[in-house]
Amino acid sequence: MEKRRKSRWPWLLAALALVLILLGLDYWNLLPHRTYTAEHFGIETLQSPLDADGDGIDDYTDLMLGARRDAENHPAYDPGYFAGGYPPEDRGVCTDVVWRAFQNAGYDLKALIDADIAENTGLYPRVQGTPDPNIHFRRVPNLRVFFERYAESLTTDPYEIAEWQPGDIVTFEGSHIGIISDKRNRDGIPYLIHNSGQ
């Protein structure tokens, strides 16, 4: 009987170790989780009446798909300065997710921001008097000013789940930016598509 008890301990310890490993992987979101959509929560997904690039996909969806495409490319985090302004496709920061999403929808966000900075330089905190089209469209504080001027401000409460729509743009205290996904967690809170050096 004594021998049998001893032989169970390695199995029990191995099972306990496996459970602890799985709990740790789940805690740090390293295991795949089921994702949900707005429809799972009875939320209507809004569609833009516009289709700037004429591809048959509304602009809100195009923004979200463009952001997802950029994230799937896994660009290396690189806040560097690039002649012409645009980093290579395999490089970028959080703001690059946004202009690439707009590009996917048929908009030249860089040109729009550059034009507004040229006309309203004093409103943009990162410009410091001299516009530089090679970098200013890639700075979160400048994007925040631009979107505050030309976009509708929505809720910042993540628990107002019906208010969050795919393609929405979110800024965080002027230091980070991303685009809302069409995927949500089990509580209905949408995921953010962004680049933070992941």
Predicted features, each with a name:
Residues E2-V19, L23-D26:
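N-terminal Sec-pathway targeting helices
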Residues D26-F146:
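N-terminal capping segments
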